[in-house]
């Protein structure tokens, strides 16, 4: 901007000066769906080897990995872009890391994720930066600050905060800040099969057999399985891939071999001469409190 001032007196004498002001545009961070944050969603239930793999209408569109982007308005300027502590450079409209242009084939991994990995995969000519986030570990949904604080488990498909990466964009005109935030859809246990091979058990017959199949889902750490039958509660403990159930103070027992279960009734119930209705109730509770239950 050139500001030119001219003073002319009554008989035509002139005094004149000019001042030049250079303008520098301030950068802007534009996230989606909100301007201050680029928000993406992943699904805990689809973490390979951990998740339950079950889907609901809320979880169907999402996987363990997701793509996202944010846009920088640089007004043609070069810039330093810092994502989660990793420094990138914009020079002549291209994005670089340590002198190498960032592309899908030369992506940059951003360390520091609490539950997954963030990878920057490139930049478009309009300043849109693309990234991929992959969820690798489950997120404890109990009392999560971003999801109903203090209300316990979130339930299958409820969103909880998994990660956040601060973004700063610096040019000669100033600094803009934003954030990449990642939500994870909570997994839940699945009790897929509970069935018996007998519809009746004769008085004097001790064993009740059947099939029990379940998975605690991604939040398997700290998961609990209980079996309630004829006034007794059996609690399961997993070791070396197998579940062992303890309980039965009346001499009864519950065993699970793979998916085949055997409930051994106490002698007091097999010889009482009465018709009994046996209700077998199984409850699977995952590490952050989600429940699957069948009888």
Predicted regions and their residues:
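Acidic/polar, solvent-exposed loop/turn segments
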Residues: 1-295
């Amino acid at each position: 901007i050139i500001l030119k001032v001219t003073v002319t007196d009554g008989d035509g004498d002139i005094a004149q000066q000019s001042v030049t002001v250079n303008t520098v545009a301030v950068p802007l961070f534009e996230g989606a769906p909100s301007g201050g944050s680029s928000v993406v969603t992943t699904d805990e239930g689809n973490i390979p080897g951990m998740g339950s793999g079950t889907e609901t209408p809320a979880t169907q569109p999402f996987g363990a990995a997701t793509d996202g982007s944010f846009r920088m308005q640089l007004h043609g300027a070069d810039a330093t872009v810092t994502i989660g502590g990793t420094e990138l450079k914009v020079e002549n409209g291209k994005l670089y890391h340590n002198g190498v242009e960032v592309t899908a084939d030369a992506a940059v991994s951003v360390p520091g994720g609490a539950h997954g990995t963030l990878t920057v995969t490139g930049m478009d000519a309009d300043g849109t930066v693309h990234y991929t986030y992959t969820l690798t570990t489950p997120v404890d949904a109990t009392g999560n600050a971003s999801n109903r604080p203090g209300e316990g488990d979130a339930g299958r498909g409820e969103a909880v905060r998994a990660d956040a990466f601060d973004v700063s964009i610096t040019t000669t005109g100033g600094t803009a800040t934003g954030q990449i935030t990642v939500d994870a859809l909570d997994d839940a246990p699945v009790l897929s099969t509970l069935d018996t091979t007998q519809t009746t058990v004769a008085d004097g017959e001790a064993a009740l057999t059947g099939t029990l199949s379940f998975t605690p889902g991604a939040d398997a750490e700290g998961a609990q399985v209980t079996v309630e039958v004829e006034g007794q509660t059996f609690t399961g403990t997993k070791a070396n891939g197998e579940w062992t159930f303890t309980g039965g103070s009346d001499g009864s027992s519950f065993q699970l071999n793979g998916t085949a279960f055997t409930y051994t009734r106490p002698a007091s119930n097999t010889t009482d001469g009465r018709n009994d209705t046996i209700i077998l109730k199984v409850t699977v509770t995952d590490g952050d409190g989600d429940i699957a239950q069948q009888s």
